Design a protein with these regions (language model features):
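An extended, acidic
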Residues: 144-197
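Generic detector of well-ordered alpha-helical packing
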Residues: 48, 71, 88-91, 95, ...
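DPxDG-like acidic metal-binding loop motif
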Residues: 78-137
C-alpha cells in the first residue's frame, strides 16, 4: 500500500461517508425529489445530502479551506489559496434512472494547481485517486494508462455527441469522472468531451 497525504485521507473518508447515503437513496429511486437546474441538468435531494456530508467532513478537518461545490457554488473562507472542489454525484442522470454508473469526485486545489483528487464509485466500491508527485492508484494499486498504440485496437469513451468519421470504437457512459478514471487505469484508451464543466 502506498502512503497518502492527510488531505487525501480526509477526502477518502468524506467520500466513503457520503457514499452510504447515495447507496441507500439509489435503492429507493422512486422516493427521490428531483428538480431541474438547466435543460439537461438535474439535481436530486441525494446530491444535496451527499454534498452536505462531504462539506461537513472536509470542514471538520480543514475549516479554513475554501470550497467549490456543484450545488452550492463557491464558498470563500479564510484560506483562499486552498479549495476543495466537489461533485457529489457525477452521472446524476444515470443515478436517476437506476443505472449503477455514477461517482463522487473531490479534488484539492492549492495555489491554482490541483494537488490531489479522487473518484469513488460507491456501487462497485472502487476508489481511484492521484496525488502530485505520488502517482495514480486504484484501490491502493498503482495504475497506468493503456499501452495500445494502434488506434483500431483502442476503445474510446465520450460524454457528448461524436461525429465518428474515423469509425473509432467508442462508448458513452454518462459519468465523465469514471470515464477519466478508467482511462488512467487502462480500461479505456482515451476520453473526450465537448462542453465539460
Amino acid at each position: 500500500m502506498n502512503s497518502i497525504s492527510a488531505n487525501l485521507n480526509i477526502m477518502i473518508k468524506a467520500s466513503e461517508k457520503a457514499s452510504k447515503i447515495l447507496i441507500r437513496d439509489f435503492g429507493e429511486l422512486e422516493k427521490l425529489q428531483v428538480s431541474k437546474k438547466g435543460p439537461k441538468d438535474f439535481v436530486t435531494n441525494a446530491d444535496i445530502k451527499a454534498e452536505k456530508i462531504i462539506i461537513d467532513e472536509l470542514k471538520k478537518a480543514r475549516p479554513n479551506y475554501s470550497i467549490i461545490s456543484e450545488e452550492n457554488g463557491i464558498e470563500k473562507n479564510k484560506d483562499e489559496t486552498n479549495f476543495w472542489i466537489i461533485d457529489p454525484i457525477d452521472g446524476t442522470i444515470n443515478f436517476l434512472h437506476g443505472v449503477p454508473h455514477f461517482a463522487i469526485s473531490i479534488a484539492l486545489q492549492s495555489n491554482n494547481e490541483i494537488i490531489c483528487g479522487l473518484i469513488f464509485d460507491p456501487i462497485k466500491d472502487e476508489l481511484f485517486y492521484a496525488e502530485k508527485n505520488n502517482g495514480a492508484f486504484f484501490n491502493n494499486q498503482r495504475v497506468r494508462v493503456s499501452k495500445k498504440n494502434k488506434i483500431n485496437d483502442c476503445l474510446f469513451v465520450t460524454g457528448g455527441r461524436m461525429k465518428n468519421e474515423l469509425d473509432l470504437p467508442y462508448r458513452k457512459s454518462g459519468c465523465a469522472a469514471l470515464d477519466m478514471a478508467y482511462v488512467a487505469a487502462g480500461r479505456y484508451d482515451g476520453f473526450f468531451q465537448n462542453e465539460l464543466n
